[in-house]
Amino acid sequence: MSDNILQVNNLTKLFGGLAAVSNCSLNIRSGSITGIIGPNGSGKTTLFNLIAGNLKSNDGEVIFNDENITDVPSHELFGRGLLRTFQIAHEFSNLTVLENLMMVPSNQSGENLLNALIKPGLVKKEEKVIREKAYEVVDFLNLTHLANERAGNLSGGQKKLLELGRTMMVDAKLVLLDEVGAGVNRTLLKDLGTAILKLNKEKNYTFCMIEHDMDFISRMCDPVIVMADGSVLFEGTSEEVKKNEKV
């Protein structure tokens, strides 16, 4: 089995004849926190969309956990443990934090009306397990005091923490973080960083993040991948990136 949880090989995506991602190749090492940086229009978000199954590629392949997942839809990848968060958090604003977390696991018995009618004991037992896990998640992320708060009332940083919590409800293997620091104040960004590091060390999560804040990237990521014109320009430590004249 490869040490790399993700391999991108010669991936290309065209929009109207223009290459947003061009013959792009990179590896994400299992257990790492990898940063991806680059100017606007360098192809970072399009690359994430291709990996996460939100877009179909024109050429190349994506290998996740030694399986070819090229163009596999995002909902199938979700079930395999590859999750992507967005620059703008997507929460159910009228539900509480706890309810948002409990909505995540798929194929719950209670989703089936027949099960709800003829197997109420099974449904209640499963709901109890999911609720207990949701409480474990809010405790892990220090959100216990907000468990019964409506998600729509949370700050930008708290919503990002809630998105991280969702990944914990399905035991993600690889999480793609798209501008985790966007719209987040410095204090909550520090909390987000702490939560990511904790998930990485204690739960063995692998992360790959797009981020413009170089201080945050330097604190969090090794290696750092630099993209330009839809492909990888350079890869190294944050210090090597800072010293490289091409970057």
Predicted segments — roles?
Residues 52:
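Helix-to-loop junction immediately C-terminal to a conserved catalytic motif
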Residues 60-67, 79-80:
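Conserved ABC transporter NBD signature motif
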Residues 150-154:
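Conserved ABC ATPase signature
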Residues 114-145, 194-197:
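Conserved ABC ATPase "signature" region
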Residues 217-219:
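A short, surface-exposed alpha-helical micro-motif characterized by mixed small hydrophobic
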Residues 37-39:
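The feature captures the beta-strand-to-loop junction immediately N-terminal to the Walker
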